[in-house]
Each structure stands twice: as C-alpha cells, then as structure tokens.
A protein has these predicted regions:
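Core of compact, soluble alpha-helical bundle domains
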Residues: 1-140
C-alpha cells in the first residue's frame, strides 16, 4: 500500500515550495540557472504548488510537461544533488518526519527521472548506476 501523507495540505505545500525556491535562488550553483530562465517567479511558484499538490495529495491540479522545461537547462547530476539537498533541508525543517520522508521519496524519484531524461535527450547512454555528467563522452 502506498504511503499517505500525515499532515500535508495545500498550505504546507505552499510553504515548502516558497521556502525551497527562496533558498534555490540564493544558491551558488542553482540560483544563476533559475534566475536566467525564470523572469516572473509568481507564475512559476503557482505551477509548483499545483505540481506538488498533484504529487503529494493526488489533486490532479498539475497537467504540465516538466521534461521539455528541463532539457534546455545546463544541468547534470551535480545540480540534481544540490536540488535534492536543499529540498531535504526544507522538508525536514517544515514537515513531520514521515511527511518529510515521503516528500523526499517523491523528489528523489522525480530528480532521477529528469536526470535520465536529460541523458536520453542528449544521446548519452548511461550504464547502470551511472550519473549524467554534461559534456562527458557517452554519446550513442
């Protein structure tokens, strides 16, 4: 049976998203990338509220396609690791332990999927357990 959130609601999701992206914008690795690609932050945040509402509460509020937005970014495994680190600190600070773990389980799955999608889009063949590193010669 799938684990269900204990204390996650729309208010908590908004708090997680706003806190997380506030930290991302200040991050030395991620901040410049986000600032270059997002001009108006509020629509992006609203989209992320809908995304995480769909992920955590099964609301079906999000109907976007995240892969096309990410394949154009100059990111690789180091960026996903940093993203996950900031996300983990955020949910551990704002959520009860079980919900933080569930958020992280979902976030890790999403990051892994996006990383594999980036590799595939860039014609990179990863071996089992290998991570995507931009400009490393694994082309198909």
């Amino acid at each position: 049976m799938a684990q269900e959130p204990i204390a996650v609601d729309e208010t908590l999701i908004e708090s997680v998203v706003r806190t997380f992206y506030g930290r991302v914008r200040k991050d030395h690795l991620l901040g410049p990338i986000f600032e270059e690609h997002i001009r108006d932050w509020e629509p992006h945040l609203q989209n992320m509220f809908a995304f995480w509402s769909s992920v955590m509460l099964h609301t079906n509020r999000y109907n976007g396609r995240p892969m096309p937005k990410h394949v154009v970014l100059p990111i690789d495994s180091a960026h996903f690791d940093q993203w996950l680190d900031i996300f983990k600190k955020t949910v551990e600070e704002l959520c009860v332990k079980e919900d933080a773990e569930l958020f992280m389980k979902k976030a890790t799955q999403i990051a892994h999927s996006l990383e594999l999608g980036l590799a595939f889009n860039n014609k990179v063949l990863l071996q089992p357990g290998e991570r995507y590193i931009r400009n490393k010669d694994h082309t198909l």
